[in-house]
Curated annotation (Swiss-Prot):
<keyword id="KW-0010">Activator</keyword>
<dbReference type="Pfam" id="PF00072">
    <property type="entry name" value="Response_reg"/>
</dbReference>
<feature type="modified residue" description="4-aspartylphosphate">
    <location>
        <position position="58"/>
    </location>
</feature>
<keyword id="KW-0238">DNA-binding</keyword>
<dbReference type="GO" id="GO:0003677">
    <property type="term" value="F:DNA binding"/>
</dbReference>
<dbReference type="InterPro" id="IPR048714">
    <property type="entry name" value="DpiA-like_HTH"/>
</dbReference>
<protein>
    <recommendedName>
        <fullName>Probable C4-dicarboxylate response regulator DctR</fullName>
    </recommendedName>
</protein>
<keyword id="KW-0804">Transcription</keyword>
<comment type="function">
    <text>Member of the two-component regulatory system DctS/DctR. Essential for expression of dctP.</text>
</comment>
<keyword id="KW-0805">Transcription regulation</keyword>
<dbReference type="Pfam" id="PF20714">
    <property type="entry name" value="HTH_64"/>
</dbReference>
<dbReference type="InterPro" id="IPR001789">
    <property type="entry name" value="Sig_transdc_resp-reg_receiver"/>
</dbReference>
<feature type="domain" description="Response regulatory">
    <location>
        <begin position="7"/>
        <end position="123"/>
    </location>
</feature>
<dbReference type="InterPro" id="IPR036390">
    <property type="entry name" value="WH_DNA-bd_sf"/>
</dbReference>
<dbReference type="InterPro" id="IPR011006">
    <property type="entry name" value="CheY-like_superfamily"/>
</dbReference>
<dbReference type="GO" id="GO:0005737">
    <property type="term" value="C:cytoplasm"/>
</dbReference>
<keyword id="KW-0902">Two-component regulatory system</keyword>
């Protein structure tokens, strides 16, 4: 039987932002805020007590920030998903949070519709995962929103596993990235990342953003088409 409700724990140190987010989240059908916390230490206790499905996590907080909190969640192997909502827009923080398993990253200030989209996407993801004991590649692609164009016949030297990794990673980003940044985030060679990005650009999955900055060669940056 399909689940009808998902519990959310909101970890945010600004009381006003916390209240606004709480009020909005409760307007999304099937989602309830089970508890709120003002810092990471309090949040960790509530995760164990309330056992939420999802944590909405800020980064800049006293006592224990969002980075340390997410790392602790993974270290303790707590079964909870995390969406980051933060003003932290530096690539180091964003990459670190995604590498530690954040399923989405929303930058403050944000439009409420962006939060709604994140929650609806999360609900769909959980429903599809929980409905099956085993999954086919096609079902996984649908869950991860991998465009079908990216998993057809690939040129020699490219494989579906890495293609899915690259595409899934790009889908989580809000800004364009260079081949070097993609390579670093996924732990692959820059030239390898460039080959996959070039293929995705040629097939219309992503678009190329050539940036000119000061002296030197222009930098090719890539972003998933909306």
């Amino acid at each position: 039987m399909a689940r009808k409700e998902w519990k959310v724990l909101l970890i945010e140190d600004d009381p006003m932002v916390q209240e606004v987010n709480k009020d909005f989240i409760t307007t999304v059908k099937g989602v309830t805020v089970c508890a709120t916390a003002g810092n990471g230490e309090e949040g960790m206790k509530l995760i164990k007590e309330e056992q939420p499905d999802l944590v909405i996590l800020d980064v800049y907080m006293p006592k224990k920030d969002g980075i340390k909190t997410l790392q602790e969640i993974r270290k303790q192997k707590l079964e909870v998903d995390v969406i980051v909502v933060s003003a932290a827009k530096d690539k180091e923080t964003i990459s670190l949070m995604l590498q530690n398993g954040a399923v989405d990253y929303i930058l403050k200030p944000f439009k409420l519709e962006r939060m709604r989209q994140a929650l609806e996407k999360y609900k769909q993801y959980k429903q599809k995962i929980e409905a099956n004991d085993t999954l086919s590649q096609e079902q996984l692609d649908a869950i991860l929103n991998i465009p079908q164009q990216a998993v057809q016949d690939l040129p020699k030297g490219l494989n579906h596993f890495t293609m899915n990794e690259v595409t899934a990673f790009l889908k989580q980003q809000t800004a364009s990235l260079s081949a070097e940044e993609v390579a670093k985030a996924l732990g692959i060679a820059r030239v390898t990342a460039r080959r996959y990005l070039d293929y995705l650009e040629k097939t219309g999955i992503i678009k190329l953003d050539v940036q000119y900055g000061g002296v030197g060669r222009p930098v090719n940056r890539y972003v998933l088409k909306g």
